[in-house]
Curated annotation (Swiss-Prot):
Record-stated family: Belongs to the RRM HNRPC family. RALY subfamily.
Coiled-coil spans in chain: 192-255
A Pfam cross-reference name: RRM_1
Keywords for this protein: Coiled coil, RNA-binding
Presence of the UniProt keyword RNA-binding in the record: yes
GO molecular function: identical protein binding; RNA binding
Biased composition, class Low complexity, residue ranges: 176-192
Name used for this protein in its record: RNA-binding Raly-like protein
Biased composition (Acidic residues): 239-249, 268-284
Lineage: Eukaryota, Metazoa, Chordata, Craniata, Vertebrata
Native organism: Mus musculus (Mouse)
Cellular component annotations (GO), alphabetically ordered: nucleoplasm
Keyword Cytoplasm on entry: no
């Protein structure tokens, strides 16, 4: 698809004639379809004086309104590049179709003349943003957009109806605030549960604290006992060392006293024997002397 002549890119003139002869092309696959292709398709309905292509949509400006309406009637819902086109008159208001999650009011399509009189056309001005947003909404619809999952509906309890009869037989209905009571009961029960949980946590913490204190006390006792035992062993060892030293000193003293006593006895014995021998010699000599005589 190729166009014969190159047209202008201006499609945003605000005069009534231009707006009424302008065509909006939505759901357009602009990645494949180019400006020359659009001109080739829509030029058969009349002379095109302007064509502007944007991301996902385009505008075609005709010379007359009759040509624009013929293009809308002939090309709307045509499938190009795998997507059905959404073609409308750009200068006419469209019926607003609310979408899920969309809160754009119908007044967003047009603005009053008093706000922007220089863009007014018959009391209103055209809003290009609306066409762009509406185009993207319909684009998701064509591709089978899955609607968001419905919110879980919480069944509400029906309020109890108490029938009180009077003597005349007329029934007087009184509605009890069941929903209020349920809400109040749920809040009170929730606060009660929280307080109970806090109490249980407090008890558990106190139990843990007592256990830790008892363990610390036991450790202190064990440390004291071990320290006392170590001191006793050290004292006993010192006493045994002192006893051994005393015994060694006493033994040395005994040996030193015994040695001089033994030396004196030996000297006396020698002297005694020497005297006896002398006496014996003297006596023996005397006897021998007598015998010789």
């Amino acid at each position: 698809m190729t166009g014969k002549t190159q047209t202008s890119n201006i499609t945003n003139k605000n005069d009534p004639k231009s707006i009424n002869s302008r065509v909006f092309i939505g759901n357009l696959n602009t990645a494949i379809v180019k400006k020359v292709d659009i001109e080739a398709i829509f030029s058969k309905y009349g002379k095109i004086v302007g064509c502007s292509v944007h991301k996902g949509y385009a505008f075609v400006q005709y010379m007359s309104e009759r040509h624009a309406r013929a293009a809308v009637a002939g090309e709307n819902a045509r499938v190009i590049a795998g997507q059905p086109l959404d073609i409308n008159m750009a200068g006419e208001p469209k019926p607003y179709r609310p979408k899920p999650g969309s809160k754009r009011p119908l007044s967003a399509l047009y603005r009053l003349e008093s706000k922007e009189p220089f863009l007014s056309v018959g009391g209103y001005v055209f809003d290009y943003d609306y066409y762009r947003d509406d185009f993207y909404n319909r684009l998701f619809d064509y591709h089978g957009r899955v609607p968001p999952p419905p919110r879980a509906v919480i069944p509400l309890k029906r309020p109890r109806v108490a029938v009180t009869t009077t003597r005349r037989g007329k029934g007087v209905f009184s509605m009890k605030g069941g929903s209020r009571s349920t809400v109040g009961g749920s809040s009170s029960s929730g606060s009660k549960l929280k307080s109970d949980e806090l109490q249980t946590i407090k008890k558990e913490l106190t139990q843990i604290k007592t256990k830790i204190d008892s363990l610390l006390g036991r450790l202190e006792k064990i440390e004291k006992q071990q320290k006392a035992e170590a001191e006793a062993q050290k004292k006993q060892l010192e006493e045994s060392i002192e006893l051994i030293q005393d015994e060694c000193v006493s033994e040395n003293a005994d040996h030193s006293t015994e040695e001089p006593a033994e030396g004196g006895q030996e000297a006396d014995g020698g002297e005694m024997t020497d005297g006896v021998e002398e006496d014996f010699d003297e006596d023996g000599g005397h006897e021998l002397f007598l015998q010789i005589k």
